[in-house]
Curated annotation (Swiss-Prot):
Pfam families: SHMT (PF00464). Pathway: Amino-acid biosynthesis; glycine biosynthesis; glycine from L-serine: step 1/1. Its EC number is 2.1.2.-. It comes from Pyrobaculum neutrophilum (strain DSM 2338 / JCM 9278 / NBRC 100436 / V24Sta). GO terms for cellular component: cytoplasm. This is Serine hydroxymethyltransferase. Its cofactor is pyridoxal 5'-phosphate. Belongs to the SHMT family. It is found in: Cytoplasm. It comes from the Archaea. The gene is glyA.
């Protein structure tokens, strides 16, 4: 019999699983769910193994099958992204970013990036990884009317400040950034362009968002668990020469990682194959659903930002909830109703610590089979809460609503016999 405390821990996990998988509308823009098949492949002995180094050049023995997995994953990502070099060893998008910064900037160098209030990720700024590497930053200018980087002002800034590295991509990311235009300006001062594709990686793989490497970026980094619905992890893909790629490779190991969380490789491969087969349909539906949610919110009196631009071209929707008490209050009230969003700073906020907005992403609910009609229902739930209805009453309706959306779509269907076959192959005790 298990100790009582382990039963208590199991109960916590069980209750979490039931709550987030079956009872909530999950609109966190940085999350997703793996397919049942990918989850099966995620459970394996590699969770406890090391493989320092690179394929064919390891510092540990016992890695012959790790090499097969890593090599296969690198080759498939390289083909899909049309990249000269891919590294799948970073354990997160942030680690991928840090390794790239370290490899491509001199000591005390300068990075041009978007601040948090314009959507920049913390790893792009002095509150995060840039500061840890003692790099200087200059802020890319923002065009509020177009909710995007101000191209003309960015050209001027690049010419004047001559940054070593320019970071595009964002944490709040509604519209594709002007990669081509910025890359042309970067070329005049010898700067590298990195596009952080963490949020839109699945949309890129699905073919509904521009591939930054084909737009002129030297590097794209990503995480493998947002719109790309795999296990948590990171990836770097480049259009650089061998020398620069080797610098990035050495920055990943030994500088920023020692263990690569090898058990994720097989599940990531499964997800990539699923995206090859189902990705265009899935990614297209994500963008359609995001637009539908935004339009429905507007009709409910909860207008998202960027109305004149069509609200969004990604999985995300951002709403200024100042008149409903601000981002903190709105997100907390919605959680009471089992609608999970996050507070988020908007460009006009005086302090990112007091955000006026909330950010939503539709990628997870899309994977559970929801479409435009369901987005309209979700908008009604959100509006009911923000207009002051008791969240407990809305929660009852949300739980009932979710009962019809428990099966993960856009993946391979496997029957019970196939599940048992895969599980028995991976189960360490058989």
């Amino acid at each position: 019999m298990l100790p009582r405390e382990l039963g208590e821990i199991l109960d916590v996990v069980t209750r979490h699983n039931a709550w987030r998988r079956k009872e909530t509308i999950n609109l966190i823009a940085s999350e997703n769910v793996m397919s049942p098949l990918a989850e099966l492949y995620y459970i394996n002995d590699l969770a406890g193994r090391y493989a320092e180094g690179t394929v064919g050049n390891r510092y540990y023995q016992g890695t012959r099958y790790v090499d097969v997995l890593e090599d296969a994953l690198v080759k498939k990502f390289s083909a899909v992204l049309e990249a000269k070099f891919v590294d799948v060893r970073p354990i997160s998008g942030t680690v991928a970013n840090l390794a790239t910064y370290f490899a491509l900037t001199p000591e005390g160098g300068t990075v041009a990036s978007l601040p948090v209030k314009y959507g920049g990720h913390i790893s792009h700024n002095t509150v995060g990884g840039v500061k840890a590497l003692r790099l200087k930053t200059v802020e890319l200018p923002w065009d509020l009317e177009n909710f995007n980087v101000d191209v003309d002002a960015a050209r001027k800034l690049i010419e004047e400040k001559r940054p070593n590295l320019i970071i595009l991509g964002a944490s709040l990311y509604l519209f594709p950034h002007p990669v081509k235009e910025v890359a042309e300006a970067a070329k005049t001062v010898g700067a590298y362009v990195l596009h952080d594709s963490a949020h839109v990686f699945g949309l890129i793989v699905g073919g509904v968002f521009p591939n930054p490497l084909k737009e002129g970026a030297h590097v794209t980094t990503a995480s493998t668990h947002k719109t790309f619905p795999g296990p948590q992890g990171g990836v770097i893909a480049t259009a650089l020469d061998d020398e620069r790629n080797s610098q990035i490779q050495r920055a990943v190991f030994p500088t920023f990682t020692s263990n690569y969380h090898l058990h994720r490789y097989a599940a990531t491969y499964v997800t990539l194959v699923e995206m090859e087969v189902f990705g265009r349909e899935y990614a297209s539906r994500i963008v359609e659903n995001a637009r539908a949610l935004a339009e429905a919110l507007a009709s409910e009196g909860v207008p998202p930002v960027a109305e004149k631009l069509g609200y969004t071209r990604t999985h995300q929707v951002a709403v200024d909830v100042s008149k409903f008490g601000g981002g903190d209050k709105a997100a907390a009230l919605l959680e009471e109703a089992n609608v999970i969003v996050n507070k988020n700073a908007l460009p006009w906020d005086k302090s990112v610590l007091k955000p006026s907005g909330i950010r939503m992403g539709v990628q997870e609910m899309t994977r559970f089979g929801m479409g435009k009609d369901e987005m309209r229902e979700i908008a009604r739930f959100i509006a009911r809460v923000l207009r002051g209805e008791d969240p407990a009453a809305v929660r009852r309706d949300v739980v009932e609503f979710r009962k019809s959306y428990l099966e993960i779509k856009y993946g391979f269907k496997i029957d019970r016999g196939e599940v048992e076959k895969v599980f028995n192959s991976l189960n360490l005790n058989t």
